[in-house]
Structure formats: C-alpha cells, structure tokens
UniProtKB/Swiss-Prot annotation:
Catalyzes the conversion of malonyl-CoA to acetyl-CoA. In the fatty acid biosynthesis MCD selectively removes malonyl-CoA and thus assures that methyl-malonyl-CoA is the only chain elongating substrate for fatty acid synthase and that fatty acids with multiple methyl side chains are produced. Residues 1-50 form a transit peptide. It catalyses: malonyl-CoA + H(+) = acetyl-CoA + CO2. This is Malonyl-CoA decarboxylase, mitochondrial. GO terms for cellular component: mitochondrial matrix; peroxisomal matrix. The lineage of its organism: Eukaryota, Metazoa, Chordata, Craniata, Vertebrata. A motif (Microbody targeting signal) lies at residues 502-504. The active site is at 340 (proton acceptor), 434 (proton donor).
Amino acid sequence: MRGLRRGLSRLGPRLGPWAVPRSLRRVLRAAGPWRGQSSAGSVSERGGASMEEVLSRSVPLLPPYETKEKAPPPAERRSAEFVRYYRGLEAGSRRAELLGCLARDFGADHGRVAEFSAKVLQAREQEREQGALLQAEDRVRYYLTPRYRALFQHLGRLEGGLRFLVELRGDLVEGLAAKAVDGPHVKEMSGVLKNMLSEWFSTGFLNLERVTWQSPCEVLQKISDSEAVHPVRNWVDLKRRVGPYRRCYFFSHCAIPGEPLIILHVALTSDISSSIQSIVKDVESLETEDAEKITTAIFYSISLAQQGLQGVELGNHLIKRVVKELQKDLPQIEAFSSLSPIPGFTKWLVGLLSSQTKELGRNELFTESERQEISEITEDSTTETLKKLLTNSEWVKSEKLVKALHSPLMRLCAWYLYGEKHRGYALNPVANFHLQNGAELWRINWMGDTSPRGIAASCGMMVNYRYFLEDTASNSAAYLGTKHIKASEQVLSFVSQFQQNSKL
C-alpha cells in the first residue's frame, strides 16, 4: 500500500485529474493494507500475472442453471488477488483498461439469453402449463446476470471488500465522466454495481453520527475535505460549523465505521435564512446556544463524501433522519428548509441569450424598458455586452446594475427552476433532489450568495426549498408521478411574469 501511495504521488501530475480521485485518496488514507497483503507488496504487472489471467482466475464461471444452488463459492484468495492487482495498477489508463475488459468480456451470456428467450416465447405460443413458462423465464433471468456480478458479490462479503467496491465504483464514475473509460458495457457495469451498493447501503445498515469539535481529528478533516458546496476556509471556520447554533451529521456504514458517506450541515436559526453569508461567513462565535431562540432548521449544505455512491439514494434518508433527531433534541423547531445554490443558472441564461440572438437577432428575455435601463448604465445595448456582464462578477459592484437586473433575473431564475425540464422533471439537479424529497419550491433570494462562486454560478441568487413535513409524502408522489412541482405564490408570481414578459 505504501508503494501504491508513492506510485500515485509520482503519477498524479502526469496522468491528470482522474489519476488520483478524491474518493480514492480518502480510501487510501483509511484503508491500510488488504487482509493477506503486506504493506510493501502488491501484485504488479512486472513479472506477475497478466490482466487477462487475473480476470480469468478472479471472475467465477456462471455454473449451469441446474447446479446453481450447489456451486461452491470462489476461492477467497482469488478475490484478494484481484484487489491487490487492481490497487497495483496505475490510476487512470491501466485501471480504465481493466474495467473495460471486465465489463466487456465478463458480462451476460447473450447466447444463452437468446436461447431461453425463444423458449419463453415457445411456451407462451404452445400455452404450456404455468410452471414450464415460469421456469423458462427464470432461466432467462439467470443468464442475464453478468459474470462480474458474482465477483462483486463475493468481494462484498470479505473484510474490507465493501470499501474496495466503493473505491472501484468511484473510479468508474470519474472515468466515465472524464471519458477515460466509456461504452455501453462499462455504463451497464457501473449501474449493476450501483444497484448492489444500494442494497448494501440501505438505511438499516447506516448509522447517523453527529460531528462536534470533540470528534476525532480524522473525521473533522474528512468533513472539511468533503465540503463541496461552501468550502471550509480554515479550522476556525470548521469549528464554527460544528459549534453552537450549528449541527453537522453524516451517515456511516457498519462495515466502514467512522467513514463519512454523505454529510449534512444545518444552521439553527430564528427564521428562514435568505443569505448564505449570514451562516458561513463572519458569524460571531458563541460558546453556548439559547434553545429558546431556535425555531428553524436550515439545511445549507449536503455533500456526498464517496464518489462511488453517486446515484445511491442517501440524501433523502439523511434529511429524514436528521429531522427526527432535531425534533427529539429541539422539539420547539417549527420550520425545516434548505438554503440551496442554483448551479447552472448563469450558464443556462447566457446560452439562452446566445440562441435568441442567433435565431431572432435580438434579446426578448428582457422587456424593452429593462433593456433600455441596462443600456443607459452600460452605454451599450448589445446582447454581447449583457452576456459579458453576467459572466463576470464586476456588475455586482454597481448599485444601479444590481437594481436594474433584480426583476428580470428573479423571474428568469423562477422559470429556470420551475419551467425548464429534463424528461419532465426539473432540469436543475439541486431542485430535482429536493422536489423528489417532497419539498416545496418556496422562495428565491436575491443576492443570497455574494461570493465570487455564487455570482458566477447563479448571479448571486439562492433558493429555499421548504419541508412541510405533513405534505412531503404527497408532494413527492405528485412530482414523481405527474411531474407536478409544488411552488409558493412568490415563485408562481415570477413564473407568470416571465410568461407574460419574456418570449422563448
């Protein structure tokens, strides 16, 4: 393992961002050597087995259907050999090659699938007894199972195996995103492993843990490293985020104790916050909290700490568990809400301005009076000037521009969250997450995030998704079933203004 760490540190600058994924770095720090592996050695390609040999030995053959219940499990040493070999490969191209080979050459037996699919059709046409039809269907299901699934299944039962599978899927996810590994077989394997991890990481196996300043340093460091929404600036900032009027929780797994899987930060306030700076920046540090002042819980950051668990439903369960925990500890809390970023809004808006200018020769997202007011301030009426304005943060330094852009950007943002869809659901991923959970699209906040990052991503706007606990189940069912978005009067008013004033 030390050799692997040294190799990764040397290779990192040369192989680029996929070389040492953040999820892998965390696993390497915490995992230690694999059982049966000395800290100095792993199977390498120099003088060792070839990739094809390792895969052939490690991936068990699918036994005949008739003997599937009697087939012995694969030898533990073969699975351990696979782990050692994988961890000994260069992160990046060589791992991508192995994953591609595993997905392509050790998948389902398509010949058998075709054979027994034909028998299912034959049984239906001949109207044979129900038992024969069900058995034929069962054979199809059996041969649809990819061979690599048995390897994953066995690895999941070994000590340290679940941690390794999360690491491997993290490499798959990051490799697919970087196009380092691609193709339908690889995407299918990533999906198969995701479904297996969803079962292993179901709520019954998860522990809810609260982070305080007295938590182990390793945990505090992981909380800081994993913060993806509002980066932690220093230890003072971190201490504030786990101190009075703040809560930080994470899920861990019984097989990977103490390792954060997904993290939720909560601010305890007297009202529904409209600005993230009031929560994470320049906040007076208090030694104690007055419970009587707390009436509201604000979920202001939720971050997945393990890339390999992407797509596994953890966030909704974490919020529900935290709500129950807060209700038990602080029963006076009346309101639960998020204070969420709006990633992608600026990019969407600039793209829309470009397409309108190209198709219509003019910008019709803003009213004539709004265009006139902005052109008087900028001394330029072209759409290109407006696009440049929105893609840098200089405009927020002008009070006149901030005032002039307030109304058009608020209604455009409302439409982006409420009206822009992907397959019928909200295009914005954060909106889709909270709406699936049953929250209400409640309030859009002008200048809710005045950091450079917030200005660049969403023109400084943030949004509250309210969790009315008595309505979350029905809201979620309506959104998932009929794609209906529950929204407040404020949001619907802005949407109506957009439909009246803007042309798409």
